[in-house]
Amino acid sequence: MTTLQERVAAHFAESIRAKQEAGKVLVEPTVQAAELMLQCLMNDGKILACGNGGSAADAQHFAAEMTGRFEKERMELAAVALTTDTSALTAIGNDYGFDHVFSKQVRALGRAGDVLVGISTSGNSANVIEAVKAAHERDMHVIALTGRDGGKIAAILKDTDVLLNVPHPRTARIQENHILLIHAMCDCIDSVLLEGM
């Protein structure tokens, strides 16, 4: 029988392996995603972010790092999590269905050249899929953070979008990689803005 200590140690070991595997395929796409966001922000655009559950928390975490700061003081950057307005979420959910809680906001707030960060560990969240479609209608770029095989979201992305797919079957490991990717993108953005890299 496995002890609790062994279970915890196994989590650490699996998390390390999952990050190492993701690092083999996601360094270049992560840089592309950061550059896409930088281009948007330098042209007075904004970043909209969405997801469900833990991915909603990641969307909010990312928006907070942009509007506040990541690790260094810098100007505020325009980013909005579409997961925080309970009145909008419940009104849209009630009147149009939960699948549309993000897409209606994207259509209302998104403009050509803006970026949508859509987060879904399965790649199959219906409301994130609808948000991606709405972003495309608005001539926005999409950065999709997914897991497993990328799901339906990976299939509808355009060549100008960026897929950050964590190739792991376990949701916890995907989520841990998503926050690492978010922090890496924040660091890239700060490095360019503050150090001219």
From Swiss-Prot:
Pathway: Carbohydrate biosynthesis; D-glycero-D-manno-heptose 7-phosphate biosynthesis; D-glycero-alpha-D-manno-heptose 7-phosphate and D-glycero-beta-D-manno-heptose 7-phosphate from sedoheptulose 7-phosphate: step 1/1; Bacterial outer membrane biogenesis; LOS core biosynthesis
Residues binding Zn(2+), per UniProt: H61, E65, Q175, H183
GO aspect biological process, one term: D-glycero-D-manno-heptose 7-phosphate biosynthetic process
Compartmental location: Cytoplasm
Chemical reaction(s) catalysed: 2 D-sedoheptulose 7-phosphate = D-glycero-alpha-D-manno-heptose 7-phosphate + D-glycero-beta-D-manno-heptose 7-phosphate
Reported function: Catalyzes the isomerization of sedoheptulose 7-phosphate in D-glycero-D-manno-heptose 7-phosphate.
Subunit (UniProt): Homotetramer.
Protein name as it appears in the record: Phosphoheptose isomerase
Organism of this sequence: Neisseria meningitidis serogroup B (strain ATCC BAA-335 / MC58)
